């Protein structure tokens, strides 16, 4: 999936994946990770998620990574924050206090860039990617994040033959295949939320599970 696809989606404000509130799984399960106050948290493919502001408000240092600069600018505008903007390697960096978003290619992040990250939050990154890119994404996470890093992963699981992605279906088997070697993976909950998501009902789905995982880098 070419980056032009996502740039065009943001340019046209076709961002049905954006949530207008903090994700309830984040607020419910994040405290159970036991991360120390001030820990740095990586949020890949972050868009303009309100979850970034929630994490910062809980006292964490937040490192978001986002390809579309419009999403980054929108985030700070909507939060009524004026960021300091500069360049760091291939990234354009927007920063306010301990909240930082790097605009650029997630795969350009190095282990040195995230060496101090003790947390990971993925609500809509893995499921935004087609099969071959999910392989690359999971491998890159494992390659750059340090041992002991803990986080949450939120996936969708549905019958992919009934609807094309994104968001793509990622079932339990795939999560464990992609991450199980390098991460401890524990399923926290998997509610069927189809009746709460009319647009997916309209597209012919007969189930829509949101699967929430606790991850810890081995």
From Swiss-Prot:
Q: What's a GO cellular component annotated to this UniProt protein?
A: cytoplasm
Instruction: State where S-adenosyl-L-methionine binds.
Output: 10, 45, 66, 123
Q: Which reaction does it catalyse?
A: S-adenosyl-L-methionine + a thiopurine = S-adenosyl-L-homocysteine + a thiopurine S-methylether
Intrachain disulfide bonds: none
Q: One of this protein's GO BP terms? A: methylation
Supply the alphabetized keyword list: Cytoplasm, Methyltransferase, S-adenosyl-L-methionine, Transferase
Q: Name one GO molecular function term.
A: thiopurine S-methyltransferase activity
Compartment(s) of residence: Cytoplasm
Show the Pfam families listed in the entry: TPMT
Write the Enzyme Commission number(s) for this entry.
2.1.1.67
Family, according to the entry, reads as follows:
Belongs to the class I-like SAM-binding methyltransferase superfamily. TPMT family.
User: What is this protein's record name?
Assistant: Thiopurine S-methyltransferase
Q: What is the lineage of its organism?
A: Bacteria, Pseudomonadati, Pseudomonadota, Gammaproteobacteria, Pseudomonadales
């Amino acid at each position: 999936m070419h980056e032009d696809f996502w740039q065009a989606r943001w340019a046209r404000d076709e961002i049905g994946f954006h949530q207008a509130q903090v994700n309830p799984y984040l607020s419910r399960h994040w405290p159970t990770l036991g991360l120390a106050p001030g820990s740095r948290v990586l949020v890949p493919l972050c868009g303009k998620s309100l979850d970034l502001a929630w994490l910062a408000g809980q006292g964490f240092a937040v490192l978001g990574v986002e390809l579309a600069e419009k999403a980054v600018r929108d985030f700070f505008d909507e939060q009524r924050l004026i960021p300091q903007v500069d360049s760091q390697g291939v990234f354009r960096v927007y920063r306010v206090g301990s909240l930082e978003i790097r605009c650029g290619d997630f795969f350009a992040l190095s282990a040195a860039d995230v060496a101090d990250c003790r947390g990971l939050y993925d609500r809509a990154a893995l499921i935004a990617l087609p099969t071959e890119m999910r392989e690359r994404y999971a491998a890159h996470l494992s390659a750059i994040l340090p041992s002991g890093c803990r986080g949450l992963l939120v996936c969708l699981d549905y019958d992919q033959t009934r609807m094309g992605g994104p968001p793509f279906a990622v079932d339990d088997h795939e999560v464990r295949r992609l991450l199980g070697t390098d991460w401890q993976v524990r399923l926290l909950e998997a509610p069927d939320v189809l009746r709460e998501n009319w647009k997916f009902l309209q597209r012919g789905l007969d189930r829509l599970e949101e699967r929430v995982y606790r991850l810890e880098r081995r």
